[in-house]
């Protein structure tokens, strides 16, 4: 899993 995507998901969640 890409850290960038994880950061985006973290922002949404």
UniProtKB/Swiss-Prot annotation:
Please list the tissues where expression of this protein has been recorded.
Expressed by the venom gland.
Residues annotated as carrying Leucine amide in the record are 13
Lineage, top-rank taxon, reads Eukaryota
Alphabetical keyword list = Amidation, Antibiotic, Antimicrobial, Chemotaxis, Fungicide, G-protein coupled receptor impairing toxin, Immunity, Innate immunity, Mast cell degranulation, Repeat, Secreted, Toxin
Supply one GO molecular-function term. Answer: toxin activity
Q: Which GO terms describe its cellular component?
A: extracellular region
Give the protein's function.
Antimicrobial peptide against bacteria and fungi. Mast cell degranulating peptide. Induces the chemotaxis of neutrophils. Its mast cell degranulation activity may be related to the activation of G-protein coupled receptors in mast cells as well as interaction with other proteins located in cell endosomal membranes in the mast cells.
Other known facts: The primary structure of this peptide is identical to that of Vespid chemotactic peptide 5e from Vespa magnifica (AC P0C1M1).
- Protein name (record): Vespid chemotactic peptide X
